[in-house]
């Protein structure tokens, strides 16, 4: 009876361990937006490294403004999107990342034309 019980416990641990390990490596960063908020830590190659990412501009300063297909493009939106993508990759490799310029609503956007917003904050404070 003890042998059977021990076998069942071992089997349960073997079945549950991968799911637990996967959840342990799953992280969430709301700044990435709903579709990209969850990510997996796939490596510890940058463990112990800390990065402070600043996209620049934001709020009342959109940076350079251009036109594409009749629509305005604002530098700050593209710089912010790139910083989020870079930060996500750094986090996936075990780094600690601080996003200095933040926009709680934009997140990573997979569209060609990124609409301008003036919601950006600097570490939570209006710009």
Predicted stretch roles:
Residues 2-8, 19-127:
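Catalytic-site microenvironment of enzymes
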Residues 9-15:
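Bacterial N-terminal signal peptides
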């Amino acid at each position: 009876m003890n042998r059977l019980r021990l076998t069942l416990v071992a089997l349960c641990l073997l079945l549950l361990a991968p799911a637990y390990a996967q959840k342990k490596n799953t992280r969430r960063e709301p700044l990435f937006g709903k579709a990209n908020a969850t990510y997996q830590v796939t490596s510890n190659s940058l463990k112990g490294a800390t990065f402070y990412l600043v996209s620049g501009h934001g709020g009342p300063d959109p940076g350079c403004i251009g036109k594409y297909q009749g629509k305005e493009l604002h530098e700050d939106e593209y710089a912010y999107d790139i910083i989020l993508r870079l930060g996500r990759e750094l986090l996936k490799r075990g780094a600690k990342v601080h996003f200095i310029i933040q926009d709680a609503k934009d997140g990573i956007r997979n569209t060609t034309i990124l609409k301008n917003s003036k919601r950006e904050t600097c570490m939570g404070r209006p710009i």
